[in-house]
C-alpha cells in the first residue's frame, strides 16, 4: 500500500496508490481507468481497501490514484524529466475480494491444474512456449 490519507470530515481513511507512466493519452479519469492494463491497479486498490476494513478501519468509498505522467515530447532528457500530475478517483468495490481469496486458496491447494484462459496474455505466452517445445 503506497499511502493512506485521512478524510477530516468523514473521519475515514482514504486508500492512495502512486503510479508513474509515460503515456501520450490525455490523463483523464476515463482514459486512465478504461486502460486494459490498469484493471489490475483497480483490483490492487480494492484489496488494500478490503485489508484496511478488515483491520477495523472505516474506509472512504473512493480510492485515488496519484498519477505522474512523464512528458514524452521533450527534445531530449538533459538530466531531468517533466511530469504532469493528476489525482484519479476510483469508486472502490471490494465486496467480492473475500470470495476471490477463498477461490485462490482453494486453487493453490488443489492438485488439479486449471484450464488456461483464452484472454490471458500469460496463458497465451505459455501456450506459445509449449508449442515451440521450450
Language model: regions and residue ranges:
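Generic internal hydrophobic packing segments that stabilize the cores of diverse globular domains
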Residues: 1-2, 42-45, 94
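Conserved catalytic cores of phosphodiester-cleaving nucleases, focusing on short active-site segments
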Residues: 1-32, 48
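A structure-centric signal for secondary-structure junctions around beta-strands
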Residues: 10-12, 42, 60, 117
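Short histidine-centered catalytic/ligand-binding loop motif
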Residues: 24-39, 83-91
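Short, charged/polar micro-motifs that form catalytic or ligand-binding hotspots
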Residues: 34-42, 110-113
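An active-site-proximal "capping" alpha-helix that borders the catalytic cofactor pocket
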Residues: 41-53
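Metal-dependent nuclease catalytic regions and adjoining charged, substrate-binding loops involved
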Residues: 51-134
